[in-house]
Regions:
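N-terminal secretory signal peptides that target proteins for export/translocation
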Residues: 1-8
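Bacterial N-terminal signal peptides
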Residues: 10-23
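Aromatic- and Gly/Pro-enriched helix-to-coil junctions and flexible linker segments
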Residues: 26-176, 188-189, 193, 238-244
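His-enriched metal-coordination microenvironments in redox/metal-binding proteins
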Residues: 137-412, 420-428
Length: 428
């Protein structure tokens, strides 16, 4: 079983990781001084209001004191249990440097709890930060794309339709090869509630074997992908976009027109690295007995080249509980890179900061460990008396991780390791 141990410098994989113990919580000011205007509103603006505002996906708005105050006890409960905001990385093990990290610190959690326990005071209105400006919910998270392709026809999901899975194809319309630097797959506003997932890829029609290049996945809680600087994905002229769709009825006839938006590098610019994204550690031989709360499965994926891992995303279904991504190095030493609890409502990509992203030598085996909870303690479990196994429906189960990386030749890998070692020495 993988254990959390420091990386060995040199031949082994390397990251400057924070394998941190949770610090003792100390709130800087007196409890009576914690107010909404001065202390809580800035936290809500940074970590909550993208969803908790009118027209977005959350059930209530938290833009103002008047909106937030009736929900104070609920806010405390969700924050203290770390179920909100939805950021489920285990902060006590593995890498802790992530881009786009909107989670709360221990001190911020303590501050929210103190504010609620003290009666949730407003404070001085003059202390309120300026209101945030938000892009329209219909706008693209990656910014305005250079190219947009829709599914070929509007797709109608009747009010009581069974789950539907299938591939839809649209001509890309591209007349020249281009390198992509950002991509977002996006259901239509009306269709959003019925789209469980949408996976887009590029099919090269000139390839006899059918060459597919993954573009992006949409699922609840997962937005577009902005690739790390100097990386990209090439798409060929004359190909087709494949939309792998999963639709689920919601009791009302609903029409969807999912689309994918692409941002390109300037013509003639070729990024230094090709970014690869794949699901790894797939286990289709799942055996999850009824009533069992901690069922483990393991999957593996061998890296053929030196690699820098840029992102990790767990993928489970309703019974999912937790997943860890580990690495078994060529010298047989083992590392845990990241662990994340699982909530089926949120498919979150954890993007590593560049200076801590795992550097792994060729021959490393990625080890994906997943746990499922088929007991009545799992709020997502409709029937804890039922055995569960692998399948495509939400009521079936899955076990794999989405992982993104780019390959490095030996010279580039050794240079990256050396730079990481020097940075570590300078920090000591």
């Amino acid at each position: 079983m993988l254990k959390s141990i420091p990386y060995q410098f040199g031949f082994t994989a390397l990251f400057v990781a924070a394998v941190i113990a949770v610090p003792s919580v100390a709130v800087a000011q007196d409890a009576s001084e914690v107010t909404f205007a001065k202390d809580i509103a800035p936290i809500l603006q940074r970590s909550c209001q993208d969803c908790h505002r009118a027209g977005s996906i959350a059930p209530m708005s938290l833009l103002t004191y008047e909106e937030a105050r009736p929900w104070a006890r609920s806010i405390k409960d969700k924050v203290v249990t770390r179920s909100m905001p939805p950021w489920y990385i285990d902060k006590n093990i593995g890498i802790q440097g992530f881009k786009y990290d909107y989670s709360l610190t221990d001190d911020e959690i303590a501050m929210v709890a103190t504010w609620v326990d003290n009666g949730a005071p407003r404070g001085n209105p003059a202390d309120m930060p300026s209101p945030r400006e938000f892009r329209d919910i219909a706008e693209w998270k990656i910014g305005e794309p250079d190219w947009v392709v829709e599914i070929p026809e509007p797709f109608v999901v009747s009010e009581e339709a069974p789950n539907w899975w299938g591939d839809l194809y649209s001509d890309s319309g591209l007349t020249e090869d281009r390198w992509v630097k950002a991509v977002e797959t996006k259901p239509s506003l009306e269709g959003f509630p019925v789209v469980h997932h949408a996976v887009t890829s590029m099919e090269d029609l000139e390839s006899e074997d059918g060459d597919y290049n993954f573009l992006n996945e949409y699922a609840l809680g997962k937005n577009g992908d902005i690739f790390p600087d100097g990386t990209g994905r090439e798409i060929k002229a004359g190909g087709q976009i494949k939309f792998n769709m999963h639709y689920a009825a919601i009791g009302v006839e609903t029409t969807d027109r999912t689309r994918v938006g692409l941002q390109f590098y300037p013509k003639g610019v070729v990024p230094e690295r090709k970014l690869i994204s794949a699901h790894v550690g797939d286990d289709e031989d799942l055996d999850i007995p009824a009533g069992e709360s901690n069922v483990r499965h393991d999957g593996f994926y061998r890296l053929k080249e030196n690699a820098q891992i840029t992102a990790f995303q767990a993928h489970l279904h309703n019974l999912g509980k937790r997943q860890c991504l580990g690495a078994v190095l060529p010298d047989n030493s083992k590392q845990i890179l990241s662990c994340a609890d699982w909530d089926f409502g949120w498919h979150i990509v954890y993007n590593y900061e560049d200076d801590v992203a795992p550097l792994l030598p060729k021959g490393t085996t990625l080890h994906v460990t997943s746990w499922h909870d088929n007991s009545d303690a799992n709020r997502w479990n409709d029937d804890p008396t039922n055995w569960a196994g692998f399948g495509q429906r939400s009521s079936d189960e899955m076990s794999f991780a989405w992982v993104s990386w780019y390959d490095l030749d030996d010279e580039s890998f050794e240079k990256a390791v050396e730079e990481r070692e020097m940075a570590a020495d300078n920090n000591n």
